[in-house]
A protein has these predicted regions:
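Active-site nucleotide-sugar/metal-binding loop of Leloir-type enzymes
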Residues: 66-79
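Short beta-strand-to-loop acidic/aromatic patch adjacent to the donor-nucleotide binding site
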Residues: 77-90
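Short, flexible, basic/aromatic active-site loop/helix in glycosyltransferases
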Residues: 108-151, 160
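A conserved acidic beta->alpha catalytic loop
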Residues: 35-44
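Short, well-formed alpha-helical segments that are part of the catalytic scaffolds
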Residues: 7-28, 40
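C-terminal catalytic/acceptor-binding lobe
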Residues: 174, 178-262
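Conserved donor nucleotide-binding strand/loop of the catalytic core
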Residues: 49-63
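Conserved donor-nucleotide/metal-binding helix-loop-beta segment in metal-dependent transferases, i.e.
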Residues: 88-122
Length: 262
């Protein structure tokens, strides 16, 4: 196994599900690195350590993705799978064979942008679909290929990961949805893509003992879309991701963390 998992996780009741999945994850990944928010309590950190996971707190939380990638690189595995852990738990639970196949593809590419199938995208609230469609339209146009960037799952070779760490700031946060692919494309890395059904909407799984079914997803999406604040948040987040990606489009590449990326 030559893949290390680099994941971020803001825990919302998924620990028991993660524990059940660890035999699969140990077979798929040479090591598992997980960053959690600074507020995460010591008991949970000890649970992760007992599972063999390298867990670390990220403070501020916006540095979580960078710190996960940074820690994963130290294992010097050939490839790294970055994933939002709540999405990965659902994926491994509901479609393990698909995920295993994606990891095979991941090992053939310097950069793999894993997107959502139309079926997976349709499970998300309209607020997410509409705002993320704008993000994808901007960067699909600029990078000259269809891309689904905010799906929370990407693959990198060791070389690509080190390239990103040298050219991004830890505080990029969710802006890395765009900054990472943009910087890699500008650096001459080819962006491979594939779509997965397993990246359907994970939020309804919170505090459940198993992944939510399609009925629960649909009910949760209606409730989500009924709140104006959710639409405001999603528009603001899309703006943040686009702004970060456009900065990466013009930032100098020859110096480490040049300028003031969002």
């Amino acid at each position: 196994v030559s893949i290390v998992l680099a994941a971020t996780w803001d825990p919302r009741g998924e620990l028991a599900r993660l524990e059940r999945l660890m035999p699969l994850l140990r077979g798929w990944y040479a090591a598992q690195v997980v960053t959690v928010p600074g507020k995460t309590d010591d008991r949970l950190m000890l649970c992760l350590e007992a599972l063999g996971i390298q867990a670390q707190r990220a403070e501020p939380w916006t540095t979580g993705r960078y710190r996960a990638l940074e820690a994963a690189v130290r294992f010097e595995a050939a490839h790294i799978h970055y994933a939002d852990l709540d999405r990965l738990i659902r994926w491994a639970e509901t479609r393990p064979d698909e995920l295993r196949g994606v990891l095979d593809v991941l090992q053939t590419a310097d950069a793999l942008i894993i997107g959502r199938t139309a079926r997976a995208m349709a499970t998300h609230p309209a607020a997410l679909q509409q705002s993320e469609r704008t993000v994808n339209a901007v960067f699909s146009h600029l990078l000259g290929q269809p891309l689904d960037l905010p799906a929370g799952s990407k693959g990198f070779s060791q070389r690509a990961a080190r390239y990103l760490l040298a050219r991004t700031l830890p505080e990029h946060g969710l802006g890395t949805d765009a900054t990472w692919p943009v910087l890699l494309a500008r650096g001459g890395f080819r962006l491979a893509t594939l779509e997965a059904d397993g990246l359907d909407w994970e939020t309804p799984d919170r505090y459940l003992t198993t992944a939510a079914d399609a009925r629960l997803q649909a009910e949760a999406a209606l409730i989500y879309d009924a709140a104006p604040d959710h639409w405001r948040y999603r528009v603001d987040l899309a703006h943040h991701i686009i702004t970060a990606g456009l900065h990466a489009w013009v930032q100098p590449l020859d110096l480490e963390t040049e300028g003031n990326p969002v």
